[in-house]
């Protein structure tokens, strides 16, 4: 008897649910199959599994009060809650939404109306006691929307937090990845220079010309940022180049107490020019690639050409010292400050130019003057200065060759600037004794050192002599001049007692 009543009640419930809550089969035929999901198909047979654990008195109450909670199609939001709870024994956990309602699932009105149903259910799927007394308002069949009281509706913010929480966990890290990509440092290519050239740059730009291996690493990482992120294998290459390349030599670190640790590396002075030539070759080969690999491309020329003092080549060092010596020699302090007598000048404008070109400059070995006739005024000697002694000790041959070249250039000067200073009253004495330079014969080849007489520094009018005779030999040795025996000259034109007596020029 009881079984027959239960069967009658169940069949009535099924017929009522089919009539009120499911569209006819013709509606599914007219729908686009691509818009229908698995949850939108008729699922009456799938929802019959709860009949084995149903409460008969509660079903009777639901039938009498027209409660439809067990036959609506499942809401996607409640389906997520059902999967999380894994408990479908209660009829309240299986809430279905009709197919006609699938167009408004994502709408706020549908979500807010069914959000109250979700808030009334626990995660285990049991019906809250407050729902048993509520009377939902049934609206038209075409919309299939269940409206509840205004107080039981939930806000859209709560629905967003509950339904889209899983999706937000994936979208937020995706959006946060863009700033990190923009903040990534700029990648620098590997420099085209060889490791030996990079090591040479580091040593050339050091203060002392020698560095430990760790500071060579730091130099390369500071100026070529590729090595900051490169694998540590490049450090082994640097050590191999230091050990095997003859351009580098190990220097003992005197400041270090242990001989094994803290050794320094320096450039071989004989290989500096070769390394600079190698750097310039790579620079001419691909300058844009080198600039792209550098942290500061404007420092390229400085890194290639700069040298510490102890890394300068010997030839360049001597040349710089000779230039410094020449500068010191041209200072105003070198001019004699005391002029006790009036100085006259003797011009050699009457000397033919071809005779002057034939004369060659030589360094005088000594003065032909006797010991009892010292010079009236002496020129300061620079050979005793410390700088001159240092230069002569290191590069005597280069300095002498440079001096000889200067004397050769002096021979080709205009004769109008080759004035010799005569001191005292010698010129008046020669005029009183009717001394004439025209009577002099030829010049003898003798060196002339212009450093002994300051030419052009005193504004005196040169005195030139006139005559038709040319001088073939005129010997000037240091501070003295001598006149040899005259040939083809009348005795009356000679100065009595002149002979080979030296005449002081200063």
From Swiss-Prot:
GO MF annotation, one: chromatin binding
Keywords recorded for this protein, A-Z: Developmental protein, DNA-binding, Neurogenesis, Nucleus, Transcription, Transcription regulation
SUPFAM superfamilies: Winged helix' DNA-binding domain
Tissue and organ distribution: Predominantly localized to the developing eye. Expressed in the eye anlage at stage 18, where expression increases between stages 21 and 26. At stage 26, localizes to the prospective retina. At stage 29/30, expression is strong within the eye vesicle, in the midbrain and in the nephrostomes of the pronephric kidney. After stage 30, expression in the nephrostomes decreases until stage 33/34 where it is largely absent. Expression in the eye decreases after stage 33/34 until stage 38 where only a few cells in the ciliary marginal zone (CMZ) show expression.
Record flagged with keyword Nucleus: yes
SMART domains: FH (SM00339)
DNA-binding region: 190-286
InterPro entries associated with the record: Fork_head_dom, FOXN1_4, TF_fork_head_CS_2, WH-like_DNA-bd_sf, WH_DNA-bd_sf
Gene3D superfamilies per the UniProt record, alphabetical: Winged helix-like DNA-binding domain superfamily/Winged helix DNA-binding domain (1.10.10.10)
Signal peptide: none
Gene Ontology terms: cellular component: nucleus
CDD domains, per database record: FH_FOXN4 (cd20057)
Location(s) in or outside the cell: Nucleus
Gene Ontology biological process terms in this record: amacrine cell differentiation; atrioventricular canal development; heart looping; positive regulation of transcription by RNA polymerase II; regulation of DNA-templated transcription; regulation of heart contraction; regulation of transcription by RNA polymerase II; retina layer formation
Keyword Transcription regulation: yes
Protein function: Transcription factor that may play a role in neural and some non-neural tissues development, such as retina and lung respectively. Binds to an 11-bp consensus sequence containing the invariant tetranucleotide 5'-ACGC-3'.
Protein name, entry field: Forkhead box protein N4
UniProt organism field: Xenopus laevis
């Amino acid at each position: 008897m009881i079984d027959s009543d239960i069967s009658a009640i169940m069949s009535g419930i099924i017929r009522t649910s089919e009539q009120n809550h499911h569209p006819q089969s013709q509606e599914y035929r007219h729908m686009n199959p691509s818009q229908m999901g698995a949850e939108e198909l008729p699922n009456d047979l799938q929802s019959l599994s709860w009949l084995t654990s149903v409460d008969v008195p509660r079903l009777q109450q639901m039938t009498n009060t027209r409660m439809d909670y067990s036959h609506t199609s499942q809401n996607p939001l409640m389906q997520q809650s059902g999967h999380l709870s894994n408990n479908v024994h209660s009829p309240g956990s299986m809430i279905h939404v009709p197919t006609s309602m699938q167009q408004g699932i994502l709408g706020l009105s549908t979500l807010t109306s069914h959000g109250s149903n979700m808030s009334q259910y626990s995660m285990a799927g049991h019906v809250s006691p407050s729902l048993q007394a509520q009377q939902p308002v049934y609206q038209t069949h075409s919309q299939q929307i269940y409206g509840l009281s205004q107080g039981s509706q939930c806000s859209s913010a709560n629905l967003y937090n509950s339904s889209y929480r899983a999706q937000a966990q994936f979208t937020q890290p995706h959006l946060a990845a863009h700033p990190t990509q923009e903040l990534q440092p700029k990648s620098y290519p590997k420099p085209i220079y060889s490791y030996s050239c990079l090591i040479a740059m580091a040593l050339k730009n050091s203060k002392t010309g020698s560095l430990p291996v760790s500071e060579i690493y730091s130099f390369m990482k500071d100026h070529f940022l590729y090595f900051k992120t490169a694998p540590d294998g490049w450090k082994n290459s640097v050590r191999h180049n230091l050990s095997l390349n003859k351009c580098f030599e190990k220097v003992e670190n005197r400041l270090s107490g242990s001989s094994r640790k803290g050794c320094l590396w320096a450039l071989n002075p004989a290989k500096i020019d070769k390394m600079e030539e190698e750097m310039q070759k790579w620079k001419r080969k691909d300058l844009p690639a080198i600039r792209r690999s550098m942290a500061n491309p404007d420092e390229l020329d400085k890194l290639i050409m700069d040298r510490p003092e102890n890394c300068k080549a010997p030839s360049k060092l001597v040349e710089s010292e000779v230039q410094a010596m020449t500068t010191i020699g041209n200072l105003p302090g070198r001019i004699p400050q005391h002029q006790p007598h009036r100085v006259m000048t003797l011009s050699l404008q009457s000397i033919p130019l071809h005779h002057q070109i034939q004369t060659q400059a030589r360094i005088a070995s000594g003065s032909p003057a006797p010991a009892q006739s010292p010079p009236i005024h002496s020129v300061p000697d620079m050979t005793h200065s410390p700088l001159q002694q240092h230069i002569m000790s290191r590069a005597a041959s280069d300095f002498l060759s440079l001096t000889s070249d200067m004397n050769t250039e002096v021979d080709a000067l205009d004769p109008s600037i080759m004035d010799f200073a005569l001191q005292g009253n010698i010129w008046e004495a020669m005029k009183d004794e009717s001394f004439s330079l025209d009577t002099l014969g030829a010049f003898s080849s003798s060196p002339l050192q212009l450093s002994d007489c300051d030419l052009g520094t005193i504004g005196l009018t040169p005195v030139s002599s006139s005559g038709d005779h040319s001088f073939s030999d005129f010997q000037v040795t240091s501070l003295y001049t001598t006149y040899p025996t005259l040939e083809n000259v009348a005795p009356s034109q000679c100065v009595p007692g002149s002979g080979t007596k030296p005449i002081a020029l200063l």
